[in-house]
Amino acid sequence: KIGMKIKSFLIASLAAFSLTAGAQSLSPSTKWHWDKGTIVVDTPERPAGQENVLGLKAPKLQTVRVGFVGLGMRGPWAVMRFCHIPGVEIVALCDYEEARAEKSQEYLRKQGLKPADIYSGAKGYEELCKRKDIDLVYIAADWNHHFPVAKMAMENGKHTAIEVPSAMNLEQCWSLIDLSEKTRQHCFILENCCYDYYEMNALAMAQDGVFGNIIRAEGAYIHCLEDFWNAYWQDPNDNDKDNLHWRMKYNMENRGDVYPTHGLGPVAQCLNIHRGDRFTTLVAMDTESFVGKDWVSKKSGKECKEFRNG
């Protein structure tokens, strides 16, 4: 009996990446124009002979060999979960800081599992992705590394699973789709809010017809991050106290919904998006930033004049 199949991770289609754009920016090379107050983005032309991956099925695997990249805040929890999934072998652990990878290694030892190989440094993920004995690369690194790690993984014949937001602009979204189509490798957005008990229950009810013909839906994600700001404030390994943690820096410099798929993903599943229907227009709104400014002012003892998100 096969304990686990690769497709059991990879239920959602790659097209969900098009939803991540709400939080990120249009890259300079993205072609777009205004149409009655709406930003209209041109859809890249699919190369001749290349097919979409909405129905892509990977060959069944007796054992899924996994490499993890990014073991800071979210990555270690993923390693812990995978330790308890039958049919999984954790082959490699990678983080810029070797000590973080070693912490996850210690968890493997406590579970009586075979030690994984450790990779670290700026190019460690490249070495991991080039291995021949990895089927899936699980990416929980900082956001700016989501795309380059996924690109390296797929170019080396690996399926990829990427934390939100997965891409930082529309060009990267389309590039991930193109890479998945060319390599025929799954590229899965780890949108955890699609798979909580409440959302899965609602999806089952929708598919069973409990709500009838769904013609309108609302979704939301409300999460005050104030409890995390201390952790996001400063890189503990940086002696320059003016250098902020990448997560805090991003919120200070960028507006928008950072990961719209938290609220929109479950709704998209209930509406069967990309299974007959698709989104044509997305609307994003925000308020004036005041909570973030107040927090930074109190933390730093200096007035914060610029905090764009929140």
Model features per residue range: what roles?
Residues 11-20:
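Bacterial N-terminal signal peptides
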Residues 21-25:
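Boundary at the C-terminal end of the N-terminal hydrophobic targeting segment
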Residues 183-188, 193-310:
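Predominantly a Rossmann-like dinucleotide-binding segment in NAD(P)-dependent oxidoreductases
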Residues 116-139:
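A structured beta-alpha segment of the ubiquitous adenosine-cofactor-binding alpha/beta core
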Residues 92, 136, 216:
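Short, Asp-centered acidic motifs that coordinate Mg2+ and/or phosphate
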Residues 26-111, 267:
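N-terminal Rossmann-like dinucleotide-binding module
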Residues 2-10:
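Bacterial N-terminal signal peptides that target proteins for export
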Residues 136, 142-143, 147-195, 209:
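Beta-strand-loop-alpha-helix segment that lines the small-molecule cofactor/substrate pocket
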